Amino acid sequence: MKDRKILNEILSNTINELNLNDKKANIKIKIKPLKRKIASISLTNKTIYINKNILPYLSDEEIRFILAHELLHLKYGKYHINEFEEELLFLFPNKEAILINLINKLHQKK
C-alpha cells in the first residue's frame, strides 16, 4: 500500500499544478474498496476516494493522473467539458497511454 505521506505529497503538488490552492485545506483522500472505479470525488465534501484494491499497483505518475482527474472535477464540475480535457492533456500529454494502463489494472484486479 502506498504510504499516506506519499499520497498527500502527490495531492499537494497536483493542487499546486492546477492552481487550486484556495481549496487545498479542504481536500481529503480516503482509501476504500470500489467495485467498478479506480477513483471518484465527492464534490460536496471534497473527498477523493481511491480504490484500495488497485492502489498498491499504481505508479506515482498514475496516482498523480488520477488525483488531477478528480481535482479537475472539483474545478470544472461533474462533466468532462473541453477545458477539463485540455487541462488534463496539458499536464499529461501521454494521457491515452496512462488511461489504457489504468483500465488494464482495474480489469486485472477484479
Curated annotation (Swiss-Prot):
InterPro entries: Peptidase_M56 (IPR008756). Coiled coil: none annotated. Disulfide bonds: none annotated. It holds the Pfam family Peptidase_M56. To M.jannaschii MJ0123 and A.aeolicus AA15. This is Uncharacterized protein MJ1213.
